[in-house]
Design a protein with these regions (language model features):
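C-terminal regulatory/oligomerization modules of transcriptional regulators
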Residues: 93, 97-152
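Basic, amphipathic "hinge/linker" alpha-helix immediately C-terminal to the N-terminal HTH DNA-binding motif
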Residues: 21, 72-92
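N-terminal helix-turn-helix DNA-binding core of bacterial DNA-binding proteins
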Residues: 11-49
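Canonical helix-turn-helix DNA-binding module
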Residues: 39, 43-68, 75
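A detector for short, charged/polar N-terminal pre-domain segments
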Residues: 1-7
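Alpha-helical linker/hinge and terminal dimerization helices associated
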Residues: 16, 26, 63, 91-102
Length: 152
């Protein structure tokens, strides 16, 4: 059975998972945030097979998450996060935060570079500053929201 593509799905979550939903792609992006730039660095830090790494890097470049940057004075290139790729930082940190809450050791603490203090956990906040739990929120059709906002 052929795998269904969600590349053009209406749902932004489905489209996002189509782009970065496999484990290797997410870990490659994580390593790019950690400073890996060269093929060999990704290969070594992740322990991933070359053929898998090649396919995932090509996909991330094609999606505009990574870009190939020439290495000055060399025929080689490096991989760098694009603006679109850097936008995944919040997503990765949210997944990390969820994983921390599921138990197990946490070898790293996320800190503010300026003062080295731990960063507050991610949370959703209402327009008035209240922290919102999952049961405090709902998705409504954008068209319905627009009509309701115009009536106010």
């Amino acid at each position: 059975m052929k795998r269904k593509s969600f590349e053009n799905a209406e749902c932004p979550l489905a489209r996002s998972l189509e782009a970065i939903g496999d484990t290797w792609s997410v870990l490659i992006v994580r390593q790019a945030f950690a400073g890996d730039r060269r093929f060999g660095e990704f290969e070594k830090s992740l322990g991933v097979a070359k053929n898998i790494l090649t396919v995932r890097l090509r996909k991330l470049v094609a999606l505009g998450i990574l870009e190939q940057v020439p290495v000055e004075g060399s025929a080689h290139h490096e991989y760098a996060l694009t603006e679109k790729g850097r936008g995944l930082n919040l997503v990765l940190m949210a997944i990390r935060q969820w994983g921390e809450g599921c138990g197990g050791d946490t070898p790293y603490v996320l800190v503010d570079k300026r003062d080295r203090k731990p960063v507050k956990p991610l949370a959703f906040h209402a327009h008035d500053g209240r922290e919102l739990a999952a049961e405090d929120m709902e998705l409504v059709p954008a068209e319905e929201f627009s009509r309701a906002a115009r009536r106010k």
